[in-house]
């Protein structure tokens, strides 16, 4: 039985993880990290705390859907004598956070993914193949999320853009375009555009388009419920609990 710690249990995905663990036969919720008062009930026996060390000591595997600074503090505490397998789904991370993730992965297994769904994992492989095969096609990526999402573009959109850039042997920072306005001239052939839309309660929609003269190809993934992210994260946690120290992605956990 995997004892799961949910870090960021009051968030949208965190709440779903708590719900999911209440009925799972092979894992149980053992510890929960929160910074504010809970407005929902926890399963009997679950430890609720705002202390990083206590939280880590109360579980075997951690699933983190929180905020960048909280993720950084979690990683730092884990590296100070409290290593645990860490599944990190927090988005909006910067270079400092990624350095911490790489450093932590030397001491414990760490799985980082901007999206935990099986569909997006497949999509990522498909767009990599398409970007390489359709070398002279223009790439445009559009992501849409609910009005409350704080980071833009989405982590998933950036992951997809990075996959396309790697397929073409270029650095994303050198070719990425995140908006167009005014008399900017013609589109440069090497551009990889990443555009963001916000509105309503959309869980997540990503469109990756490859456009040429006479034809175009579009890949679309739509998440109709955030529960798909929770299920993917729990599946990843069960897999990660058996792994050695190192840095992993969701494709590793899914075996694709």
UniProtKB/Swiss-Prot annotation:
Positions that bind NAD(+): 8-13, 89-91, 113-116
A GO term from the CC aspect: cytosol
UniProt keyword terms in alphabetical order: Amino-acid biosynthesis, Cytoplasm, Diaminopimelate biosynthesis, Lysine biosynthesis, NAD, NADP, Oxidoreductase
A Pfam family the protein falls into: DapB_C
UniProt binding sites for (S)-2,3,4,5-tetrahydrodipicolinate: 146, 155-156
GO biological process, one term: lysine biosynthetic process via diaminopimelate
Active site, UniProt feature: 145, 149
Chief location: cytoplasm
GO MF terms, alphabetically ordered: 4-hydroxy-tetrahydrodipicolinate reductase; NAD binding; NADP binding; oxidoreductase activity, acting on CH or CH2 groups, NAD or NADP as acceptor
Residues binding NADP(+), per UniProt: 36
Protein's UniProt keywords contain Protease: no
UniProt cross-references to PROSITE patterns, sorted A to Z: DAPB
E.C. numbers: 1.17.1.8
Cellular localisation: Cytoplasm
Catalytic activity: (S)-2,3,4,5-tetrahydrodipicolinate + NAD(+) + H2O = (2S,4S)-4-hydroxy-2,3,4,5-tetrahydrodipicolinate + NADH + H(+); (S)-2,3,4,5-tetrahydrodipicolinate + NADP(+) + H2O = (2S,4S)-4-hydroxy-2,3,4,5-tetrahydrodipicolinate + NADPH + H(+)
Pathways per UniProt: Amino-acid biosynthesis; L-lysine biosynthesis via DAP pathway; (S)-tetrahydrodipicolinate from L-aspartate: step 4/4
Family in the record: Belongs to the DapB family.
Function: Catalyzes the conversion of 4-hydroxy-tetrahydrodipicolinate (HTPA) to tetrahydrodipicolinate.
Protein name: 4-hydroxy-tetrahydrodipicolinate reductase
Designated gene of the protein: dapB
